[in-house]
UniProtKB/Swiss-Prot annotation:
It comes from Homo sapiens (Human). PANTHER family: RHO GTPASE-ACTIVATING PROTEIN 29, SPERMATHECAL PHYSIOLOGY VARIANT. This is Rho GTPase-activating protein 29. Residues 481-501, 541-600, 981-1011, 1117-1153, 1178-1238 are annotated as: Disordered. Changing residue 552 to C: In a breast cancer sample; somatic mutation.
């Protein structure tokens, strides 16, 4: 029986290579001769054979690990298992213990550890492991020799060297064998043995796949448990931190309390441990437990599905091969039967042929040949069927082998995958319990230290200190401390109330918010016991343990000496206080609005906003302001603002107490803009203010602001809170992205955007012009034609003016809101390097919300989609040039300004610095520039290069444009120098005589005029015209006493209603040096510089009634000029007008001329040669007296100005009937001819002829 087993073992291990297999086979063969020997027990031989087989397997596993490119750890594990098996054999079979065997094992261990696995690759693998392979062969050869000698009896038992194998054996000193128990002794299998065991099972793949699926479900449950547990712990830590902070604040202000420092330390330990636990939870949720395990589970699921699909494919192939084999076998049997039938038929035919004779022989021969042919065909078919059957058998065998190999590979892959998953699970489990152990150990240590400290406290110690402090004899020191403490503690107030009142601040106070929040600390330094105990007496509820509902244990002012407290106010009705009772009460003190008013709600978690209320129990059902559910039970009500909510909603309440009745819910999102704007004094919705303010406080540098979406649930909650609480909502608890979403949602849901539907086409046309200018800039950016760059600047200025004109047509509330939003977005763009949001990105986001067409039912077309880019481009332009477009303050909605009433905000401008003076010159030169055609020279382009910059410092931000210098030339610069030098002489030498401006009419207050029936001309905005009216530095020297009754507020800066209020304008005419101007004009004529045509449309108030003014000029000389009610224009050269605005030492004043009302035809020109006498056209034309117009001792100025009027071309073209339907009595009363409105004059070809004239300097009148 033993011999039979040995033969079977020899056949099974015949594939093993090397000397080891040969030696083992020889030794096993030697067992035959020793089987009959009585000294060898059969059980002992069987055990010896099993040990030898196990040692052989270990050697083969080590070789396979080296050949299969395994990791260093795997090879070391295989070596460790080999040495462990060898050691067990030597301990069990002492006859095999030999020095040679131990030396061979030691050599193998040294060779394996000497290999540098980082340098191993496919090329040098054989060279690096050559010595390892030789060591393995040496160990196998030595073991085989010893075993052969022992079994063959060549060496006696006594001759064998029996060395005890101790733990200090050098062969095993570096391998941790003792700590690893034998896997075979425990019943465990090696990886290959696991695969071999599963291979014997027909359903091995299904079993392994089911185990992998079960592992995934198991891991999913573990991860779910850990995540839920961590979330609960995280929520608990947050609540613990809130509770500890509140308690620490409350006990911090109370002096001489027993174990106060101990409990403070305990609270600090709770806060610190909570923070550490939060960090631990975050780490476990990230890369310490949840994420690695989920990643491994997902990988397991993915590979399991792939393996399952592969196994199905292999099974299908095997099934197809077996079906083909069955079909081939049936076909072969069928062909064999057919062949047998043909053969038997052939045999009968031959017998008939032999028995036949005569004439039948021929027929029988034919039949015989036929049947022989059939027999041959049947035989051929049989052979073909047999060949097909053999092929199918071969195919089935190949498929079966492939299936076995695939099965083996799949089992190995699944085993590796399961081992990896187990390794990951082990690692993350170790992390989980290790981190929890560290957390618990630190908490245990801190609790032990607190316990030891509490044992050292002496009862009554703090009370003794309190008595000593109160009976102190140093009264002056105490009084000083009292005053010092009161002054220092008074501004601090109560933290929650002060920290929440900053919510509704405007952006200008945003810099103080963080300082205010930081100053609301509850820790009070100095002798605070004076405040807590000296003033006031013990209350009944606190000293005698009165009502537990009247005061809260969490209150800041629970101390008996809280002198800020007042007696609780009870409602007059006995059940609930009415709104009238609340309105008649005096404002609450800070102590009443703090957390000391919680009463019975001391155990309820409250938000910061909830702490500002003074709650009481609700006694009648109503609606909750937080969740909008019906409150029946567990409801609370604020005694001051009557806010009602569930007790559970106090933790998330965001509405602050306003100390007066809270208004009802408003319809904010999707409501008409005017309904919200009319409730604000400046017309800007409160939601726009508080959202922009909060974003500017803490999110200007947040990356992706206004682009990243927020939490939908929190956004809806904030929208609901804003409708319920309006400006009393504390939005600091919400994230910045949620606030941005609310702001965008409000703008998107407006029925009509800030830019009205009726102005949509004009703004889209403006956006197209902006696109055209941008394209020209891109094309000419790299060109060498620098002369065209000033023209680009002129185009930009023209677009700026047009945009200002269009924006002034918006209602005051729309304009102010758009101004506020654009300025806010400009601040966001200023931090584009941090938040990655430039003006283009914001234009794409806010474009469709700020300007959109009137909604229609028409289908969406490509052209309508293309308008989105125009909307975004317009908003981008407004943001980029916001400082130039919105150069004034906001417009109040209702401000009265009547003729003759002195406005408080209309005072003369202060003296300007040289830089501001240059800016104002450039700005004013732009007001009188032409919008139609402006030619510039090379000198102008050079000045433009020095002066144009759209990104200058903020001190020049009120200037209309930084490229206004392109409208001035060298003549202006020279005139500036001489005019300033002349002005300096006047200031040094003498004081100019005052110029008084008086009115012939009384300056009594008048009521507001009837609303206008005609639209104001929009060729230039009103604020541009009025900016030139008030006296400034240059004309202030020549105007001493100015009647401010003639000046009115600037609508852009002081908020004059453009539709309802009439305005009074004072025009100024300054003198100039005749000789200086002549030089300038000669130089200007040589350069053929600027030829500009301007038209200044005066305000509408002068179109309805005249204003008579009187100028007293340096003595008794005066001129009375009556301004007609008809509109008049003032065409003038922009360069000369700019020069005449500067004062001169020769002629400090210029003559004032009445306006000319007779308008020329649109095909004529305003050109007029020099005239020695300047006429004033009033009731009739007559020469003006030089003595009346010019001061004594001065010559006549041939370059005077004539003020004229030109109707608005838009009004003339749009409403011709209205213009011509005016009654003629007004003009007849003033003696003025009836003149039809003149249309806007296009540029004529004849103008070029006048520009080319060289005989004389052109003069426009």
């Amino acid at each position: 029986m033993i011999a039979h087993k040995q033969k079977k073992t020899k056949k099974k291990r015949a594939w093993a290579s090397g000397q080891l297999s040969t030696d083992i086979t020889t030794s096993e063969m030697g067992l035959k001769s020793l089987s009959s020997n009585s000294i060898f027990d059969p059980d002992y031989i069987k055990e010896l054979v099993n040990d030898i087989r196990k040692f052989s397997h270990m050697l083969l596993y080590l070789k396979e690990a080296i050949f299969s490119d395994c990791f260093k750890e795997v090879i070391h594990i295989r070596l460790e298992e080999l040495l462990r098996v060898l050691k067990s054999i030597m301990n069990k079979h002492q006859n095999l213990n030999s020095v040679d065997l131990q030396n061979a094992a030691e050599m193998l261990t040294a060779k394996v550890k000497a290999v540098n696995f980082t340098e191993v690759n496919e090329e040098n693998k054989n060279d690096l492991f050559q010595e390892v392979f030789s060591s393995i062969e040496t160990l196998a050869f030595t073991f085989g020799n010893i075993l052969t000698n022992f079994l063959m009896g060549d060496v006696g038992n006594d001759s064998l060297l029996r060395l005890p194998v101790s733990r200090e054996t050098k062969s095993f000193e570096n391998v941790s064998v003792e700590s690893v128990d034998s896997s075979s002794e425990k019943g465990n299998f090696s990886p290959l043995e696991l695969d071999n065991v599963l291979l014997k099972n027909t359903d091995s793949i299904e079993l392994a796949l089911s185990y992998a699926k079960t592992w995934s479900k198991y891991t999913k449950n573990i991860v779910s448990w850990v995540e839920k547990k961590l979330n609960l712990e995280l929520e608990s830590t947050r609540n613990m931190v809130k509770l500890a902070e509140a308690t620490r604040t409350n006990i911090g202000i109370q002096e001489f309390m027993p174990l106060q420092s101990l409990f403070t330390n305990a609270l600090l330990n709770d806060i610190e441990s909570s923070h550490l636990l939060q960090q631990t939870i975050a780490a476990l949720q990230a890369n310490k437990f949840v994420q690695p395990l989920l990643g491994r589970k997902n990988e397991m699921e993915k590979q399991r599905k792939e393996i399952k699909e592969l196994w199905k494919q292999e099974q299908n192939k095997m099934l197809e091969a077996e079906n083909a084999l069955k079909k081939a076998k049936l076909l072969c049997m069928q062909r064999q039967d057919e062949y047998e039938k043909a053969k038997s038929s052939m045999f009968r035919a031959e017998e008939e042929h032999l028995s036949s004779s005569g004439g039948l022989a021929k027929n029988l021969n034919k039949q015989l040949e036929k049947k022989r042919r059939l027999e041959e065909e049947a035989l051929q078919k049989v052979e073909e069927a047999n060949e097909l059957y053999k092929v199918c058998v071969t195919n089935v065998e190949e498929r079966r082998n492939d299936l076995e190999n695939t099965k083996r590979e799949i089992l190995a892959q699944l085993r590796t995958l399961v081992f990896q998953c187990d390794l990951t699970l082990k690692a993350v489990t170790v992390n989980l319990f290790h981190m929890q152990h560290l957390q618990a150990a630190s908490l245990a240590d801190s609790l032990q230290s607190l316990c030891d400290s509490a044992k050292l406290y002496d009862p009554g110690q703090e009370y003794s200190e309190f008595v000593k402090a109160t009976n102190s004899t140093e009264e002056e020191k105490v009084d000083g401390n009292v005053n010092k403490h009161l002054n220092s503690s008074q501004p601090s107030g109560f933290g929650p109330a002060n920290s929440l009142e900053d919510v509704v601040r405007l952006p200008d106070s945003s810099n103080k918010i963080e300082e205010d929040r930081c100053s609301n600390s509850a820790d009070i330094t100095g002798p605070s016991f004076i405040r807590s105990w000296t003033f006031g007496m013990f209350s009944d509820s606190e000293s005698t343990g009165g009502s537990s509902e009247s005061r809260s244990l969490d209150s800041e002012s629970i101390s008996p000496g809280d002198f800020h407290r007042k007696l609780p106010r009870t409602p007059s009705s006995g059940t609930m206080s009415s709104a009238d009772d609340l309105d008649e009460r005096e404002p609450p003190s800070p102590s009443e609005t703090g957390p000391n008013s919680l009463g019975t709600f001391k155990k309820t978690l409250m938000s910061k906003a909830a702490l500002t209320h003074k709650f009481r129990k609700l006694r009648s059902p109503t609606k909750c302001r937080d969740c909008e559910g019906i409150v029946v039970f567990q409801g609370v009500e604020c005694e001051e603002c009557l806010l009602v909510c569930h007790r559970k909603c106090l933790e998330n309440l965001v509405i602050i107490c306003g100390h007066q009745k809270l208004p009802g819910k408003i319809h904010l999102f999707g409501a008409e803009f005017t309904q919200v704007a009319k409730k604000e004094p400046d017309g800007i919705p409160f939601i726009l203010k508080i959202c922009a303010s909060e974003i500017e406080n803490r999110a200007l540098c947040l990356q992706g602001i206004y682009r990243v979406c927020g939490n939908k649930i929190k956004t809806e909650k904030l929208c609901q809170a804003l409708e319920n609480g309006m400006h009393l909502v504390d939005i600091s608890e919400f994230s910045s992205h949620d606030i941005c979403d609310v702001l965008k949602l409000y703008l998107r849901q407006l029925p009509e955007p800030f830019i009205l539907f009726r102005l949509y086409k004009e703004f889209i046309d403006l956006a197209k012009e902006i696109q055209h200018v941008n394209e020209e800039q891109e094309t000419k950016k790299n060109s060498l034609e620098d002369k065209k760059w000033p023209n680009m600047c002129i185009e930009i200025n023209r677009i700026l003016l047009k945009s200002k004109d269009l924006l002034r047509q918006l209602p005051a509330s729309n304009f102010n809101s758009l101004h506020f939003l654009i300025v806010h977005l400009k601040r966001v763009v200023d931090h584009a390097e941090e938040n990655k949001m430039n003006s283009k990105n914001l234009g794409v986001i806010f474009g469709p919300s700020l300007i959109r067409p009137r909604p229609t039912t028409a289908p969406i077309t490509i052209s309508s989609l293309a308008e989105y880019s125009n909307q975004a481009r317009l908003v981008e332009f407004l943001i980029t040039y916001s400082q130039k477009i919105f150069d004034g303050s906001l417009q109040p909605q209702d401000v009265m300004c009547s003729i003759g009433v002195v406005d408080q905000g209309c005072f003369p401008k202060p003296l300007l610095s040289p830089e501001e003076r240059d800016i104002e010159r450039s700005m004013k030169s732009l007001f009188f520039s032409s919008k139609e055609d402006i030619h510039t020279s090379e000198s102008e382009s050079k000045i433009f290069e020095r002066a144009t910059s759209f990104e200058e410092s903020e001190r020049k931000q009120n200037a209309l444009g930084k490229c206004d210098a392109c409208l001035s030339d060298k003549a202006q610069l020279l005139l500036d120098q001489e005019a300033e030098s002349a002005s300096q002489k006047i200031e040094d030498g003498k004081t100019p005589k005052p110029l008084s401006l008086k009115s012939d009419r009384s300056t009594n207050n008048v009521e507001r005029h009837t609303p206008r029936t005609k639209i104001r001309p929009v060729s230039l905005p009103v604020d541009r015209l009025l900016l030139a009216s008030p006296p400034n530095e240059r004309n202030g020297r020549n105007m001493g006493n100015v009647n401010l009754d003639k000046f009115c507020k600037n609508p852009a800066f002081e908020g004059v209603n453009r539709k309802d209020a009439a305005t009074t304008v004072c025009s100024k005419f300054n003198g100039f040096d005749q000789q200086t101007l002549q030089k300038i004009q000669d130089k200007q004529y040589e350069q053929n510089s600027l030829t500009a045509k301007t038209t200044m449309i005066m305000p509408s108030a002068l179109q309805e009634k005249g204003v008579t003014t009187s100028l007293q000029i340096s003595g008794d000389h005066s001129i009375n000029a009556t301004q007609p009610s008809k509109p008049y224009a003032e065409p003038v050269r922009s360069v000369r007008e700019a020069s005449e605005r500067r004062s001169s030492d020769s002629y400090p004043l210029a003559p004032v001329r009445a306006p000319r009302t007779l308008q020329p035809q649109h095909w004529t020109t305003f050109y007029k040669p020099h005239a020695p006498i300047i006429s004033i056209r009033g009731n009739e034309e007559k020469p003006a007296s030089p003595s009346a117009a010019v001061p004594p001792g001065t010559d006549h100025d041939p370059h005077g100005l004539v003020v004229k009027s030109m109707p608005d071309p838009d009004k003339a073209s749009a409403c011709p009937g209205q213009a011509t339907g005016q009654p003629k009595e007004d003009s007849e009363e003033l003696g003025l001819p009836d003149v039809n409105p003149m249309c806007q004059r296009p540029r004529l070809k004849r103008m070029q002829q006048f520009e080319d004239l060289e005989g004389e300097i052109p003069q426009f009148v």
